[in-house]
């Protein structure tokens, strides 16, 4: 049970038919709406380590919409792969630091292995160095947006206020980013 990934592969390879599949709840879905935005959130039960079934349920429950944004955890783990599977565009968010660049390279390799289109957003773009930009240039990866560090963004989030509502200039940055995503056919990003 603890090692199960929910893929059914063990049943396929067990010639004796000794393995059976059963339903084990791993989490739940919460649905919500704010003005024109519908939200589906998957919550993993405490003590459960396997989130891909919850992610699949979120994707299945997501409304048919012109734009579907799936926010994944960072990294290249199974939950990330399940989150990006089938995406029209994978938007990788990074920071221009050595750690950020290392993680970006791993994520780019994963997305390329899945043969999915990708682009990059550089967060806190005014810190660090230019190596992230150089990597993207050398790999022909579009940088759709660079967002400089702004303490007011963190302060707004700490109050539960989205940056785009607290700061009009952030709203313009995100609106411009959305236009770029949509122009690339990113209906399922």
Region locations from a protein language model:
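Iron-sulfur cluster-binding cysteine motifs and their immediate structural context
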Residues: 1, 5, 9-25
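Conserved active-site and cofactor/substrate-binding residues in soluble primary-metabolism enzymes
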Residues: 5, 46-53, 102, 165, ...
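Conserved Radical SAM active-site core
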Residues: 6, 25-38
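Inter-motif core of Ras-like GTPase G domains
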Residues: 77-98, 104
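C-terminal lobe/tail of nucleotide-utilizing enzymes
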Residues: 110-189
């Amino acid at each position: 049970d603890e090692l199960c990934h929910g893929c059914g592969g063990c049943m396929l390879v067990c010639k004796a038919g000794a393995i059976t599949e059963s339903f084990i709840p791993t989490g739940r879905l919460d649905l919500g709406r704010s003005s024109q935005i519908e939200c589906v959130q998957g919550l993993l039960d405490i003590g459960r380590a396997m989130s891909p079934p919850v992610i699949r349920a979120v994707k299945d429950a997501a409304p048919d919409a012109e734009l579907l944004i799936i926010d994944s955890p960072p990294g290249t783990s199974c939950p990330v792969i399940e989150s990006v599977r089938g995406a029209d565009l994978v938007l990788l968010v990074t920071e221009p630091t050595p750690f950020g660049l290392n993680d970006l390279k791993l994520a780019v390799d994963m997305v390329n292995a899945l043969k999915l289109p990708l682009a990059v957003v550089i967060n806190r773009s005014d810190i660090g160095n230019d190596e992230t930009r150089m990597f993207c240039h050398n790999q022909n990866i579009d940088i759709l947006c660079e967002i400089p560090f702004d303490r007011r963004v963190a302060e707004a989030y700490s109050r539960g206020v989205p940056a785009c509502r607290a700061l009009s200039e952030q709203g313009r940055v995100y609106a411009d980013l959305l236009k770029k995503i949509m122009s690339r056919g990113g209906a399922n990003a």
